[in-house]
Curated annotation (Swiss-Prot):
Binds 2 heme C groups per subunit. This is Cbb3-type cytochrome c oxidase subunit FixPc. Residues 108-196, 203-284 form the Cytochrome c domain. It comes from the Bacteria. Heme c 2 binds at residues 173, 216, 219-220. Heme c 1 binds at residues 121, 124-125, 261. It comes from Rhizobium leguminosarum bv. viciae. The lineage of its organism: Bacteria, Pseudomonadati, Pseudomonadota, Alphaproteobacteria, Hyphomicrobiales. Belongs to the CcoP / FixP family. The chain crosses the membrane at residues 37-57. The gene is fixPc. PANTHER family: CBB3-TYPE CYTOCHROME C OXIDASE SUBUNIT FIXP (PTHR33751:SF1). SUPFAM superfamilies: Cytochrome c. Its cofactor is heme c. It is a single-pass membrane protein.
Length: 287
């Protein structure tokens, strides 16, 4: 048995440990700390009795209060859903113009539309709606089918070139490889690129103007500004959906690529489509 050691200065027993002649006094813990520790033990026992706490083989103790975190969550969800019912009903009953003019409804619709956008639209258009190659940027003011509320709603509801919806936007640029010879294709590509950039060959671009007037102006307009009613893009704004440069234009003229957007009305319902419309319009590019 080790010999007890009493500190000669304080008269307090030491722990028996020594480091380079330094000994640790074995003072008792403060009484307030001890009673606090005992209180936490009592509180823990009371909690284990009152609430679900002790895991069993297939379940856990229920607790005397019958509390359930799942039931509490469901109650909170039901309360939140009930508080939103009135606003959802108003959105369902009003037009997108009426919703947009009501600040409270507009704010609620934007929040709902932002949530629906992340789940259904961000895969193609990006989480920030900035798009990518082949997928339009929804933040700018370049709209193939129009950027006002009615046009955006129609596009979301019925999609673009979507076979399952008879009201879908349906326009396709024909393949001009069967109409134009390779030289004419290079000429019109140089002309279109030259509308916003420096063409590789000014002579080709000059000759391409007449090729454009004869073959492209019917859809894109004499000024190449496009026509929303036909889904024909503006070629004079330096915004390119698929790729940039004369080579990319040559490929698109010869064998066009056409994107498809699903019709969302049948999947999401009219109310969510309206919320998406308000949200997309609020991004800054809506007209």
């Amino acid at each position: 048995m080790s010999e007890k050691h009493i500190d000669e200065f304080s008269g307090v027993e030491t722990t028996g440990h020594e480091w380079d002649g330094i000994r640790e006094l074995n003072n008792p813990m403060p009484r307030w700390w001890v009673w606090t520790f005992y209180a936490t033990i009592v509180w823990a026992l009371g909690y284990a009795i009152a609430y679900p706490a002790i895991p069993m083989i297939t379940d856990a103790t229920k607790g005397m209060l019958g509390f359930s975190s799942r039931a509490e969550l469901q109650q909170n969800l039901d309360q939140a859903k009930a508080s939103q019912t009135t606003l959802h009903d108003l959105i369902a009953a009003k037009t997108v113009h009426e919703i947009d003019s009501d600040s409270a409804l507009r704010e609620f619709a934007i929040a709902g539309g932002a949530s629906a956008f992340k789940v259904n639209c961000a895969t193609c258009h990006g989480s920030g709606a900035s798009g990518g190659p082949g997928f339009p940027n929804l933040n700018d003011d370049d709209w193939l089918w129009g950027g006002d509320l009615d046009a955006i709603q129609a596009t979301i509801a019925h999609g673009i070139r979507f076979d399952g919806d008879t009201d879908t936007h349906a326009s396709e640029m024909p393949p001009f490889a069967e109409v134009l010879d390779p030289l004419q294709t290079r000429q019109v590509a140089a002309y279109v690129w030259g509308l916003t950039n420096t063409p590789s060959d000014p002579g080709l671009a000059e000759a391409g103007k007449q090729v454009f007037v004869d073959n492209c102006a019917a859809c894109h307009g004499d000024d190449a500004k496009g026509k929303a009613e036909m889904g024909a893009p503006d070629l004079a704004d330096a915004i390119w959906l698929k790729a940039r440069g004369e080579d990319a234009i040559i490929r698109q003229v010869a064998a066009p690529k056409h994107g498809v957007m699903p019709a969302w009305a049948g999947r999401l319902g009219d109310t969510t489509v309206k919320e998406l419309t308000i949200f997309v319009h609020s991004l800054g590019g809506g007209t």
